[in-house]
Curated annotation (Swiss-Prot):
Protein's UniProt keywords contain Transcription regulation: no
Lipid attachment points (GPI-anchor amidated serine): 385
GO molecular function list: chitin binding; chitin deacetylase activity; metal ion binding
Cofactor(s) the protein requires to work: Co(2+)
Pro-peptide positions on chain: 19-39, 386-410
One Gene Ontology biological process: fungal-type cell wall biogenesis
Chemical reaction(s) catalysed: [(1->4)-N-acetyl-beta-D-glucosaminyl](n) + n H2O = chitosan + n acetate
Designated name of the protein: Chitin deacetylase 3
Stated family: Belongs to the polysaccharide deacetylase family.
Organism: Cryptococcus neoformans var. neoformans serotype D (strain B-3501A) (Filobasidiella neoformans)
Amino acid sequence: MYGHLSLSTLSLLAVVAAAPFHESWLQPRDSDVSQLFRRGAPDPKASDYLSYYPSPGSTPNVSTIPQAWLDKLATVQLPNVSVATANDGRPTYPNNENDGDSEICSFTDQCYVEDDLYSPPGEKVWALSFDDGPTDVSPALYDYLAQNNISSSATHFMIGGNIITSPQSVLIAIEAGGHLAVHTWSHPYMTTLTNEQVVAELGWTMQALSDLNGGRIPLYWRPPYGDVDNRVRAIAKGVFGLVTVLWDSDTNDWAISDQPDQYSVASVEAYFDTLVTGNRTQGLLLLEHELDNNTVEVFETEYPKAVANGWSVKNVADAFSMKWYLNSGKGNDDVVTTMSVAGTLTTAKPTHTSTSVASATATSSASVTDSAGVSIASAASSQESSSWPIANRPSLFVIACGLALAAIMV
C-alpha cells in the first residue's frame, strides 16, 4: 500500500518520527510529587489569571484543594500532635503540652529536627534569603542584587497571595536567576491550622510558583513566624516533599516597622554588624525580609560589609549543597522533568521561563479536575516541551522504520 511513495520520502518519515526520541524521556518518574501539579500554566497577563487560584490574603478554602493532594495526605503517617491555638502570637497546645518536647518539637520553643535547614556548613557562608515577597520594594531589591551579580545567590520565600497579585515581580526575580521557595499562601501560624488547611497553604503557593517558573516545583519552604512542629513538618515533607528552612539568627528587620519603640534601622544594623564583621566563622542563615524600604536598606548597608569581611553569599540550596527545585537541578534554566496531564513523562529543554509562560487556554489530551471543578494539567515547563506522549515515541519510531523497510522491499 506504500508503493506510491518514494524511498526518499519514506526514509524522511522515519527520520522525522525518530528525531524527537531521547533516552531521557524514558527515565523513571522524577518524583511522586510532580504528579500533584497537573494544570497548564495560566498567562499572568490574562484578565482571568486570578480566577485560577484561591483568593489572596486568607487560608484557601478546603473545597479548592485538588483531590490528588488530599489523597496524598491520606497516605502520610502523621505524629500524634494536636492542632495548636494562637495565644498572643505564641501557639499553645491542649492539656499544657510542652511545645519544646521531642514529640511536638515546635521551633517557637527553638526546637528543630535533623532534616530542618538551620545553619549552613562551612566557614563564612551566608545563606541569603528574603521572606514575604513580592512587595512594592521587591523590584528595587532585585535591581540591587542584579547590580552586584548576586541575583542567583538569594532565595526568595514568597507568599502565595503576593505571587498572584504581583506576578510580574516574580518573573523579574526568575529572569534574574533568583531561587524561589514557599512562604505559604497567607502567612498564618501553621501549627494552628488543620491538616487540610496546611496542605492548601503550601500546595497553592507551590502551584503559583511552578506556573510562573516553567513547571519548576519548589523544594523548600519557611514557616511564617518560624511556627512549625512535627505535624506540620510531616505534612510538608510527606505530601509535597518540602524541606523546612529555619534560621539561626533573627535580624529583627521586620520589627523596625512593627515595633518602632524597640527597633530602628540603626539598631538592627548594629546587631547585623556583630554577625558579619565580628570574629564569627560559622555559617549564617538569617531571617531577613523584602517587606519595605527599611528592610531593604539594612541589607544594602550590611552586604558590602560582609563581603569585605570575607563572607561568601549563597542561596539556601547552594549553601547546603542541595538542588534548587524538586524536579530541576540548579538555576531557572536547567532541565525540568514533569508529568504530563496523561501521567507520562516529558523533559523540557533548558530555557529562561519568563518569556514562555503558557497560555491559560492551553489544551491537553486528557482532563483532570480538582474538587472545585477546576481543570488541572501539568505545570508547563516551557513552550518548547514536546506535546507527544512519551508512550507513543518508541512505537512511532518502529512504525517509521517499518515504512522505510517496506519501501525498500517494494
